[in-house]
């Protein structure tokens, strides 16, 4: 609801909050349905039934996600990889496994085309922006000592951040 309240107004866009599996939309009323970085949180079989109901014939369904952050200087990239794949492992919820499988283990309703491997989100981030992104990870939100862990991560990151650099280039490879 807070994100919807902050969304920019547009005369041709109607914002609403509803369960993805029970949208309340009319039958065959949508040309496209896009799920961005969220399909792993949904009850996919129920969502697929809802999409089949609300999507017009020939409509487009797209599941888009992203692989772990890439493109950092080598020492920082190693730190990011270890943080994501090892240090936070005990706090990742079970649904995150779908992301690691690149959604290939979820039933897509109909024919599918993979997202081209060269598509990615390009980022130019400060240390604070990187930490802000990391703090949104579900594992960090579930960690027993998240505030202390974030303080420790900041200290580690300060030691790894290249001297004299304000912002660094990263990218998130798209998948789906």
Give the location of each predicted region.
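Class I SAM-dependent methyltransferase SAM/SAH-binding core
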Residues: 1-26, 46
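Hydrophobic beta-strand segment of the Class I
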Residues: 33-34
């Amino acid at each position: 609801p807070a994100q919807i309240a902050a969304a920019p107004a547009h005369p041709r866009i109607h914002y609403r909050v509803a369960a993805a599996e029970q949208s309340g939309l009319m039958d065959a009323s949508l040309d496209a349905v896009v799920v961005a970085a969220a399909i792993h949180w949904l009850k996919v079989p129920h969502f697929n039934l809802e999409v089949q109901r609300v999507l017009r014939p020939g409509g487009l369904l797209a599941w888009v996600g992203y692989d772990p952050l890439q493109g950092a200087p080598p020492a920082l990239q190693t730190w990011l990889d270890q943080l994501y794949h090892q240090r936070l492992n005990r706090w990742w919820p079970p649904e995150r496994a779908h992301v690691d499988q690149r959604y290939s283990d979820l039933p897509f309703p109909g024919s599918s085309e993979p997202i081209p491997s060269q598509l990615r989100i390009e980022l130019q981030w400060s240390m604070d922006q990187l930490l802000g992104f990391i703090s949104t990870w579900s594992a960090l939100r579930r960690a027993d000592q998240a505030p202390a862990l974030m303080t420790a991560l900041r200290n580690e990151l300060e030691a790894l951040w290249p001297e004299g650099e304000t912002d660094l280039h990263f990218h998130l490879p798209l998948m789906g």
